[in-house]
Curated annotation (Swiss-Prot):
The chain crosses the membrane at residues 27-47, 86-106, 157-177, 180-200, 266-286, 307-327. GO terms for molecular function: ABC-type oligopeptide transporter activity; ATP binding; ATP hydrolysis activity. Disulfide bonds: none annotated. GO terms for cellular component: plasma membrane. InterPro entries: AAA+_ATPase, ABC1_TM_dom, ABC1_TM_sf, ABC_transporter-like_ATP-bd, ABC_transporter-like_CS, P-loop_NTPase, Type_1_exporter. This is Putative ABC transporter ATP-binding protein MG014 homolog. Residues 365-611 form the ABC transporter domain. PANTHER family: ATP-BINDING CASSETTE SUB-FAMILY B MEMBER 10, MITOCHONDRIAL (PTHR43394:SF1), ATP-DEPENDENT PERMEASE MDL1, MITOCHONDRIAL (PTHR43394). It comes from Mycoplasma pneumoniae (strain ATCC 29342 / M129 / Subtype 1). It is found in: Cell membrane. The keyword Transmembrane helix applies. ATP binds at G400, P401, T402, G403, S404, G405, K406, S407.
Length: 623
């Protein structure tokens, strides 16, 4: 939270100070009002006696706090002053309360704003393994629900953390000052009240943790089923998935019911003990003071206002206890949420290397003794002993069975994963000594999953230019020309120009209104528009027909002749004309040579090629 406070400007810092101050001022007024009301009631019940004293010239004296008295010249003056005082105090209390709520709202709202901004920035910068560890659904809950709980806690802290204890302490002090005999009842019931509240709050912490886990689980369930809707439909898994959701929903319902039940028990228990306090107080007063009577005798009329004031302060005490209990409940929930937020914020970020005056490097790529793995210890070094070199300006292919580690290599090249051991060199220089921004601009990668952003085709293709300093101040006409050139390279112009609004055609979230092949071509155009020196195509033309794929490869070869091109595919026909082909099997290099030589030396390559040929692959077509 200290990091959030540093982001506050003068206005928010002022609100941070004013919120508890005005809350405290409101509490003082709330505590004084019952005493003025008790004095006003005393005037009403003792009006005959007071008028007699006024007529005799003794003046009018009315009981106030702690046996003090308010003196007036006449009964009428007492009535006017007391009534006016109560009205003015109530108005001031209202104004102070509104100001404190307004200030607390400003601070709480900005706390959630800065927290969300900080968490989102962290999500954008954490390492890929950390992102994989959480998953998008869990990160979404922490960015929204957990931050909202922190917003509530901030508001409660500024309002209730001041209001609750002072209402309790102030109410207790004024109750004792009003009627010490009746206050003995508080010593009997309050220990029991505190004991019950303490037990309930202790039980609430694990219940809220389980509830948050249930929220994560049901979000994961929904995200999986919604994103995999077509699979569910095609395999007729609707009933199966509904049963899984029913189980997750039942767990969430059970945890929510338990946590809500336990954390709302404090309210009825508190009111029960409050009622017991009043009953015990009345019994004590009747036992200790035999002069108390419920009759209109003037001598006993003064006790009635004190009983009224005591009951009012008892209400404040109860209110303070309830607010304290609710604050503790929210604190418990927010503490769990804060722990989950800190867990994300403490995750390591992708290391950025800043190298002033970065020299231009040749687009060669070399792996030396690289090992990497994800998940548990058994998979820690799934990729092992990767030693290879891609020369600048040439085309290379990476092929292998499903799950062999091809995409892991692509992610390592793209800088998403750092190897567990070994070194990577670009242009003969270790990537640890290369400026990170320079390296990111140097390497362009088109992933298997082509994620497009909501907007237009133009905004998606030109997104690669947004972070390029050399393009920031270029006119739109030049950017449009680069966009159309990139679309032509990716053969995306053929379908884009069929739209009535061409490049301004709307792209829905994740590109849902485009076909798989259209999304792949837009993704390729988005990458080649930046003219990367090293281009990685990770199975990114799988949805294209053979002729379109051939045309895209030719365009890339002709338009980016100096670029080192790395094509990852399961289809050997897509990469067999590369200068060299690297065969990956179970995370290791099984072969690295030309197509012709691999047919003589690599059994896995031969088997894959024969299997694809048996399935109808055309290996005689000209690439």
């Amino acid at each position: 939270m200290g990091l959030v406070l540093k982001q506050f400007n003068r206005k928010i810092r002022t609100a941070l100070i004013l919120a508890p101050l005005f809350t405290f001022a409101q509490i003082i007024i709330d505590l004084i009002i019952p005493s003025f009301l008790a004095s006003a009631i005393a005037v009403v019940f003792s009006i005959v006696t007071l008028k007699q004293k006024e007529a005799s010239g003794e003046g009018v004296a009315v009981d106030f706090i702690a046996e003090s008295k308010l003196s007036f010249q006449s009964v009428q003056e007492a009535q006017i002053v007391l009534a006016t005082s109560v009205i003015l105090l109530a108005l001031f209390g209202l104004v102070f309360g509104l100001i404190s709520i307004f200030c607390a709202s400003i601070v709480a709202g900005n706390t959630s704003y800065f927290l969300r901004r900080k968490i989102f920035r962290k999500i954008m910068h954490i390492t890929a393994p950390s992102h994989d560890q959480y998953g998008s659904s869990t990160l979404l809950v922490r960015l929204t629900n957990d931050v909202y709980l922190m917003e509530i806690m901030t508001f409660d802290f500024l309002r209730l953390i001041v209001r609750a204890p002072f209402l309790f302490i102030g109410g207790l002090a004024f109750a004792i000052a009003t009627n010490s005999d009746m206050s003995i009842s508080l010593a009997i019931t309050f220990p029991l009240t505190f004991l019950v509240i303490g037990i309930l709050n202790k039980k609430s912490t694990p219940l809220f943790k389980n509830n948050q886990k249930s929220v994560d689980q049901i979000n994961e369930r929904v995200e999986e089923d919604v994103s995999g809707y077509k699979v569910v439909q095609s395999f007729n898994l609707k009933d199966t998935e509904c049963l899984k959701f029913k189980a997750a929903n039942a767990r969430w319902t059970k945890s929510s019911t338990n946590s809500l039940f336990v954390n709302t028990l404090n309210i009825p228990f508190t009111f029960f003990f409050s009622s017991m306090t009043i009953i015990i107080a009345l019994l004590l007063v009747f036992q200790l003071d035999n002069s108390v009577r419920v009759d209109p005798l003037p001598d006993n009329a003064a006790i009635r206002p004190s009983i009224f004031a005591f009951f009012q302060y008892n209400f404040y005490i109860v209110l303070g206890l309830i607010l304290t209990s609710l604050t503790m409940v929210n604190f418990t929930r927010s503490r769990v949420a804060l722990g989950r937020i800190k867990d994300v914020l403490n995750k390591p970020e992708i290391q950025q290397h800043v190298v002033p005056d970065q020299t231009v490097l040749a687009p060669s790529l070399e792996f030396k003794n690289v090992a990497f793995g994800l998940g548990n210890k058994e998979n820690r070094d799934f990729l092992q002993d990767l030693n290879f070199k891609f020369e600048a300006g040439k085309t290379y292919g990476i092929v292998g069975p499903t799950g062999s580690g091809k995409s892991l290599i692509a992610n390592i090249i793209g800088g998403l994963y750092e190897p567990n051991q070994g070194e990577i060199f670009v242009g003969g220089q270790s990537i640890k000594t290369i400026d990170s921004d320079y390296l990111a601009k140097m390497i362009g990668i088109v992933f298997q999953q082509n994620i497009l952003f909501k907007g237009t085709i133009a905004s998606n293709i030109k997104i690669g230019l947004e972070t390029r300093e050399d393009w920031k101040h270029e006119p739109d006409s030049k950017k449009d020309a680069a966009m159309k050139r990139a679309a032509a390279i990716a053969c995306a112009d053929t379908f884009i120009e069929k739209f009535s609004d061409t490049y301004d055609h709307t792209v829905e979230q994740l590109g849902k209104n485009l076909s798989g092949g259209q999304k792949q071509r837009v993704a390729i155009a988005r990458t080649v528009i930046t003219k990367p020196q090293i281009l990685v195509l990770d199975d990114s033309m799988s949805a294209l027909d053979a002729l379109t794929e051939k045309k895209v490869r030719e365009n890339i070869a002709n338009e980016l002749p100096g670029t080192t091109k790395i094509i990852i595919s399961q289809n050997i026909n897509s990469i067999k004309y590369a200068h060299k082909i690297m065969v990956i099997d179970n995370g290791r290099i099984a072969g690295f040579d030309s197509d012709a030589k691999l047919m003589q030396s690599c059994d896995i390559y031969v088997k894959m090629k024969q299997a694809q040929k048996d399935q109808g692959g055309d290996f005689d077509a000209v690439a």
